[in-house]
Amino acid sequence: MQHYVGLDISVKETSVCIVDKAGKVIREVKVATEPVAILAVLTEEPLALERIGLEAGPLSQWLYSALAEAGLPVICVETRHMKAALSAQINKSDRNDARGIAQMMRVGLYRPVHVKTLASQKRRMLLTSRQLLQAKALDIENDLRGTLRNFGLKVGMVGTVKFEARIRELVADHPDLAAIVEPLLIARRVLREQLGVLHRQLLEIVRHDEVCRRLMTTPGVGPVVALTFRATVDVPSRFSNSKAVGAAFGLTTCRQQSGEIDRMGGISKCGDAMMREMLFEAAWS
């Protein structure tokens, strides 16, 4: 008899629910959120597992890879689709969510999402880490500009390289302000240095990636945009055609139609926000 599994994942524990093809609950248990513990439950009895569902999330890629490597029919479900399916429950709990996911697997009411390869996950981590350091450095610079303006000290137009020297010049006659500014300048300097380290790693990856080099022949597309696109698409064969890529990035319009009303709205903004931001910058550069 076919069986279906729902996994409701949290940081420490995962709720597991196994149902048969008639929807009857066979087993419910909580285990540690570790591949070994989950595999032990799923392989403890010789059940014919048809589908194993888990919600897309921070830990789903790790668990999905481990279960797939073990030869289990695991499926990662799109978050918003799962939320809509489970919202009919009156009482929300990890146990009920796992039971709901198992029933979704049984009736086929789910929308699978692509789980990125390990290489793409590493590229993505490099890109987000670089973006984080860049954002924090800019936050410090903007904060210094704003706070010094309160004292009539205007930074003006100055580049990244000469920014620190300009700040020191402004506070030279204000020792109390200089004492406050100094830690911020040190923090900014360290952030900029480590940002450079990550950017050099990014350039090294792009330099040895044929697809990225080909993408960079497009006007406006630099190494950051190219690697972001490469990491987001991951496996091109998962798209039926080139138009599907735009829809996956949330760049297609939304439609709201009911009776005589038929409205075309703005873009859906589904999918990767970072990718849309990069494409926007590339289009305007």
Regions found by a protein language model. Name each.
Residues 1-285:
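A detector of single, family-specific signature residues
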